[in-house]
Amino acid sequence: MTNPMMSVSSLLTSGQQKVPMVPSPFGPPIVDRDVLSSSIAPTDPSQFCVPSQFGSSGLPNANMPNPLSSHFYSGWGILPPEPIKAVTTRNEMFERHHAARAEMEMYSLYQQRRMERVNPKGLSGLGIPLFYGSSCLGGPTGFQGRSTLPASDVHLHRSTFRHLQGNPILLATRPHFTECWGQKYRLRRGAVYQKPPESDTESFKSQAEEKSSSQMPTLSYEEEEYIKDPDIEVDNQQKPRVADGKPTTVPANPHGELHTHQRKPSSLEANAWDDGKGKPSEQVYEGCDGKNGVFRPVSILPLSGTHEQVALRENCSLSDIQKWTVDDVYNFIRSLPGCSDYAQVFKDHAIDGETLPLLTEQHLRGTMGLKLGPALKIQSQVSQHVGNMFCKKLPSLPTHARQAFDQPADTSPLLDMSSWSDGLSIPGPQDLLSPKRTEQDVMRN
């Protein structure tokens, strides 16, 4: 009986095809010499060897290269062997496909994480219907260029629109977000709120005319709205009005009221550190009054009441901090309480007005050897000086922005987006002042 481990299975003969036998896993594979061509198989039977399926086998003759191990896969099959180059090309194509797919998944994950970082409550925490239109690029990448709802089918409440401006996620997407909302403000609100949007647009026009002419300070805002707004006048005809010949008790102009509110704290703070001199306080707030803009100046907290510090503030607040010399910085550091010992360090490092705002806490404590308290004092005073100069250099704001700065809001003025767009693209103050007007009507009745 023939041992099956030593049996030879011939795949093809000269004129007859046979079914190949399964090789035994306990021994080396054996291939008939008739299968291979004369160019591949050596004529000498002692030099014939087939690479093992468990690894590359060495040839008995070292001078004879192994053609099967480099050009063909080891093993048997009916199909012709496939070159390794084609296999590697196909594998590279598969790897590129999987890498691109993984990259797309990682990008979508990154977008989601970034949106969650801006707004931890998610997109539902906004409380408004989000639009992924061409003008508002705030939505995910897959939804850009689409609108979830047509503009005519949106029901938007005034309170929602009021909180829209200071929203941080909308602030991060695009600065002109309220521009597109101001153009789409004529929306359907149901049967009750059909006329207020038109009256709001008329109040926008009245504000624009008031800003351009600036010759109507005697009329109160309430009377102006009643004149410009026939719809609201019709609605309020049910309530008797007594203000025919008597002057109203409402302030003459909210913007005038803003100027008075604005000058009061400046005069109070000026009395705190002018020590009988009227010039320093007037010059400090000269650039921040109603003429140059309504920015409320960042008040410099007086750390000591010495005359030297007052004189230094008089010079430093009027000049640009970037124009300071090394001696100016030396005098500035020496005037701060508790920092006079480190003034020479600033002079040794040649710190002038351009490099002073660039110093960080690491520079002050690590490089220059300051303690934590003086370093924080210096950083606070420098940032306040830079903030004052920023307020002086910015142009004047429109009327509605002044009112937005004067009103106590939940969001800080830095998040107010009303200064980025025109007067006609901002919700009118009628929405913001409607509860105040109703209270005044009740008091008048």
Swiss-Prot record:
Entry's Gene Ontology cellular component terms:
cytoplasm; nucleus; PRC1 complex
Q: Where is the SAM domain?
A: 324-378
The residue ranges flagged as biased composition, category Basic and acidic residues, are 227-244, 434-445
Query: Where does it reside?
Result: Nucleus; Cytoplasm
The induction text for this entry reads: Transcriptionally regulated by CRX.
Tell me the Gene Ontology biological-process terms attached to this UniProt entry. Answer: negative regulation of gene expression; negative regulation of gene expression, epigenetic; retinal rod cell development
Give the keywords, sorted.
Cytoplasm, Nucleus, Repressor, Transcription, Transcription regulation
Q: Superkingdom of this entry's organism?
A: Eukaryota
Keyword Transcription regulation in annotation: yes
Record PROSITE patterns: SAM_DOMAIN
Q: What are this entry's molecular-function GO terms?
A: DNA-binding transcription repressor activity, RNA polymerase II-specific
Domain note = The SAM domain mediates its oligomerization and localization to nuclear polycomb bodies.
Q: Kindly state the subunit structure of this protein.
A: Monomer, homodimer and homooligomer. Component of a Polycomb group (PcG) multiprotein PRC1-like complex. Interacts with PHC2 and NR2E3. Interacts with RNF1 in a PHC2-dependent manner. Interacts with SAMD11.
Q: What is this protein called?
A: Sterile alpha motif domain-containing protein 7
